[in-house]
Every structure is written in C-alpha cells, then in structure tokens.
C-alpha cells in the first residue's frame, strides 16, 4: 500500500511568496500585519503567529473568522525569507487593488501632492516614501509597473502600516501618467541635482496649486525624457559635503517643504 499524499494537500496552504506570483503574498511585522487586519479592503487568507504576538494584536474584529496558526519563532523560516524581521507575525494576503489612475484622481481629495517614482526599485525606499507620504500629507505614490518595486512583505513592513492607507499604484508608462496629471492641472516638479531652482523658492510661488513631484532612482536619477516633461526642475539645497541624498530622504524633505510652503 502506497502512502497517500492527500493528507498534505488538505493542510493550510502556507507557501513561501515569490516575485513571480503575486496572487498571494506574505506580510510580516507587527505594524504591517495590524494595519492589514484593520483594512476592510484587504483580502486576507490566514495568519501565522507566535502566542505572545497574537496576544499583542488584541481583539481585532477580523481575527474571529480568520484561520490562525500558532507557531514557534523558528517555523517562520518555512514561509518567509530568513532575513525577514517578522516580530512573530505573518499574514497571507492578496495584493491591494487601488483601481486605476483615473479612479484615484476622480475620487481622492486633491489637497496634498502626488509623488511619482521614476525607476525606484528598492522596496525599502519605496516603503519609506509611502510612510512619509502619510505622515506629511502626500496624496498618493505612483510608479512604473516594470521599473518600480512591487508590493512585497519587505516593502509593506518598511511603510510601517501606511501602505494600507496611502494609495500606491503603478502604470505602464510614466510619460502618459505625466500627461494625465497635466490634463488634471497638476504642476509637474522634478527633483534633480542639476535643477536651476531651489525647491523651497519654487514652492513659495506655487501656493494653492496641485503638485506632482517626480523622484528618480539613486545613482541615475531622473531619465532624460522624464526631465523634459517636467514643468520645473528643482534641487534640494544641501551642504556641499552632502550633495546626494537617499531618495527616501529626498522625498521626506520634499513633502515636508510642500506642507510648509504650499
């Protein structure tokens, strides 16, 4: 008599997420998991937790009808990368669907700037930018479908809960996105070290206008064609000994300046 494999297939489908399949992904870390559980628009499949971490979540409504597997800390390695700082929590979810750019522009409160990322691929940077957008009043963060970081557990953890509240959409064509924003009367401002205008000086002249900031990847910065489509190119005034900023730091400074001067 051969061994049946059915007993395995009946178990909860805890799978290590991959960059090739985004139908389901694993979120991890306390703030990321707590925020996802509190988001009624997030499709959730199951929760993996240590007993202590599960107790810390408290009595969230969605925990009452959610499959929960209480495990030891070492068991997370079966589902997550060994470098994932999970804090005793992992949540299997479907990636968020924020709809189309048109949906966003037609339904979102236009108060607050939009941040566009031109080939920013590092998930830690993108997550940090989304976090800054929530804290400093950014309306949304937009990027390129093929050249910006996708939603992953690491990105969502870096956003520290903000990912569930700040729209993050990607589009196939950044140039077309810029055209769409211009049609909606947004002023397009590119951040670039070669910009002839200082960021704060420009913002003082753009009060009560809709603004979209574009930031490029570290190293290469904004692409040539992206620069050509901007209404303005500006630089952040820094000390000469520090003329290149991390893109997430640059985004935070830009959003703070916009909040203060727009």
Model-based region annotation:
Residues 106-196:
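RNA substrate-binding interface of SAM-dependent RNA methyltransferases
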Residues 34, 39, 134-135, 156-160, ...:
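Structured adenosyl-cofactor binding patch, chiefly the S-adenosyl-L-methionine
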Residues 52, 73-76, 146-148, 218, ...:
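Short, acidic/turn-prone active-site loops that include or flank metal/cofactor-
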Residues 1-106:
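N-terminal positively charged helical leader segments and presequences
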Residues 56, 148-154, 220-229:
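Short, glycine/polar-rich helix-capping loops at beta-to-alpha or helix-loop-helix junctions
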Residues 22-24, 43-47, 139-141, 165-167, ...:
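Short active-site oxyanion
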Residues 27, 69-73, 167-176, 234:
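Short acidic-hydrophobic, aromatic-tinged amphipathic segments that line or gate anion-handling sites
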Residues 118, 189-242, 246:
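Active-site/ligand-binding-proximal alpha/beta "capping" segment
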């Amino acid at each position: 008599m051969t061994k049946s494999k059915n007993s395995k297939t009946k178990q909860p489908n805890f799978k290590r997420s991959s960059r090739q399949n985004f139908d389901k992904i694993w979120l991890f870390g306390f703030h990321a998991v707590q925020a996802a559980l509190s988001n009624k628009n997030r499709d959730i499949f199951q929760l993996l937790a240590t007993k202590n971490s599960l107790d810390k979540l408290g009595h969230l409504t969605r925990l009452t009808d959610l499959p929960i597997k209480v495990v030891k800390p070492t068991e997370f390695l079966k589902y997550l990368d060994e470098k994932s700082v999970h804090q005793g929590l992992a949540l299997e979810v479907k990636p968020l669907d924020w709809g189309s750019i048109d949906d966003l522009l037609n339904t979102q409160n236009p108060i607050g700037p939009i941040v566009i990322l031109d080939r920013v691929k590092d998930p830690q940077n993108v997550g940090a930018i989304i976090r800054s957008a929530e804290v400093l009043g950014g309306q949304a963060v937009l990027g390129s479908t093929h050249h910006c970081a996708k939603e992953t557990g690491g990105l969502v953890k870096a956003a520290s809960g903000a990912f569930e509240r700040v729209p993050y959409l990607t589009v196939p064509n950044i140039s077309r996105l810029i055209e769409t924003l211009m049609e909606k009367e947004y002023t397009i401002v590119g951040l670039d070290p070669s910009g002839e205008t200082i960021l704060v000086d420009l913002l003082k002249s753009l009060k009560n206008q809709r603004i979209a900031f574009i930031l490029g990847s570290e190293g290469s910065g904004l692409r040539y064609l992206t620069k050509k489509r901007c209404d303005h190119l500006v630089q952040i005034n820094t000390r000469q000994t520090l003329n290149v900023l991390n893109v997430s730091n640059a985004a935070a400074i830009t959003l703070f300046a916009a909040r203060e001067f727009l």
